[in-house]
A protein has these predicted regions:
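Long, low-complexity, highly charged intrinsically disordered regions
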Residues: 1-48
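Extended alpha-helical scaffolding segments
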Residues: 49-147
Length: 147
């Protein structure tokens, strides 16, 4: 997948026109304006917040999941996003097994780093024991989805 393609290139002309009209009609609301703004960005330009929001809002969900997985793999740690790491893992765990399974090799590496290499104990992010357990729970959900 080309991470440099603008997100609007993944929309039909009609869908993109709808995004524009929504942003114009509801210009006082942040969500339609944000949606229009991200359509003019490529995946690699999206912030971690944008990726989390894409999954939460069910827009470009598969592309956002792909980008999160790519970033985790490139950085060789699921904690690259600092304070957003837990929320990103939570959102990633909500993705369908079909989408996650397409990235099985990279997710297996991530899971191994969390489970076997104890990356969670060496993360730059300070987590309480409860937060670590929650994080591991999200990892287990992903693990079960890609079996």
């Amino acid at each position: 997948m080309n991470r440099k393609m603008k997100l609007k290139e993944f929309l039909t002309n009609e869908e993109y026109e709808g995004v524009i009209q929504n942003a114009i009609q509801y210009s006082d609301m942040s969500l339609p304006v944000w949606y229009l703004e991200i359509t003019n960005k490529c995946l690699c330009e999206l912030s971690n917040f944008d990726l989390i929001r894409c999954i939460s809002q069910d827009v470009f969900k598969d592309l956002a999941a792909f980008e999160i997985i790519e970033r985790i793999d490139e950085q060789n740690t699921p904690f690259y996003a600092d304070i957003d790491s837990t929320e990103m893992m939570e959102r990633l765990s909500s993705i369908s097994p079909e989408i996650l399974s397409a990235h099985k090799c990279k997710l297996d590496r991530m899971i191994e780093n969390v489970e076997r290499n104890n990356f969670i104990d060496f993360a730059d992010v300070c987590m309480s024991d409860e937060e670590k357990e929650m994080y591991k729970g999200y990892v287990n959900i992903i693990k079960n989805k890609i079996k």
